[in-house]
Amino acid sequence: MKKEIASHLLEIGAVFLQPNDPFTWSSGMKSPIYCDNRLTLSYPKVRQAIAAGLEELIKEHFPTVEVIAGTATAGIAHAAWVSDRMDLPMCYVRSKAKGHGKGNQIEGKAEKGQKVVVVEDLISTGGSAITCVEALREAGCEVLGIVSIFTYELEAGKEKLEAANVASYSLSDYSALTEVAAEKGMIGQAETKKLQEWRKDPANEAWITA
């Protein structure tokens, strides 16, 4: 599953690997990878594979789920497809409450005591997913965990998720992606080394000259 999804993401250009010409993230950090899972929306076969995979993860790890919650905005579509496949209620969670109307942060119904699984497109440092989890907990929901399409497998993300006491499972990850990219001849040994060094310590730009 991990390599299959990784292959899909590479084929449609949802993930770019540029170890020799790094991207600059909004945080200012240099990165050899850029992920835009919104592109999956434009490819029916890919999004169907993702929905089926997320459903499988949820049934395996969170079988008592009662509500599917998407993170705004990237997780909303995938949450909708998964909830439809599972015939479950769905809601989505904003990064913060609206400044108008009812001032809702949670749109749709997620009632006190209900068991909820969060659907996220990408786990980087885990910030947006944890914001979603906290909002649901404040509403009295029991958050069973998070499922996502892809994770960078960053230590900072793992630590934040552990600190928030929330389980998280991804369809694919950085390790599988770099392995598939190497198998496809998209990166060579030197590029693979840079990618491995970046993941060990993203804040240390020494990987650029590795």
Swiss-Prot record:
GO biological process terms held by the UniProt record: 'de novo' UMP biosynthetic process; pyrimidine nucleobase biosynthetic process
User: What does this protein need as cofactor?
Assistant: Mg(2+)
The protein's matches in PROSITE patterns, at most eight in alphabetical order, are given as: PUR_PYR_PR_TRANSFER
Which reactions are catalysed by this chain? orotidine 5'-phosphate + diphosphate = orotate + 5-phospho-alpha-D-ribose 1-diphosphate
Q: What class of enzyme is it?
A: transferase
Q: Any keyword DNA repair?
A: no
Q: Which SUPFAM superfamilies match?
A: PRTase-like
Instruction: Look up the record and name the pathway of this protein.
Output: Pyrimidine metabolism; UMP biosynthesis via de novo pathway; UMP from orotate: step 1/2
| Assigned keywords, A-Z | Glycosyltransferase, Magnesium, Pyrimidine biosynthesis, Transferase
In terms of superkingdom, the source organism counts as Bacteria
Enumerate the residues binding orotate.
124
Q: Which Pfam families match?
A: Pribosyltran (PF00156)
- Annotated 5-phospho-alpha-D-ribose 1-diphosphate binding lies at 94, 98, 100, 120-128
What InterPro entries does the record point to?
OPRT, Or_phspho_trans_dom, PRibTrfase_dom, PRTase-like
The family note in this entry says: Belongs to the purine/pyrimidine phosphoribosyltransferase family. PyrE subfamily.
Role of this protein: Catalyzes the transfer of a ribosyl phosphate group from 5-phosphoribose 1-diphosphate to orotate, leading to the formation of orotidine monophosphate (OMP).
Query: Which NCBIfam families does the record associate with it?
Result: pyrE
Q: How does it assemble?
A: Homodimer.
User: What's the protein here called?
Assistant: Orotate phosphoribosyltransferase
Species:
Bacillus cereus (strain ATCC 10987 / NRS 248)
Q: What is the lineage of its organism?
A: Bacteria, Bacillati, Bacillota, Bacilli, Bacillales
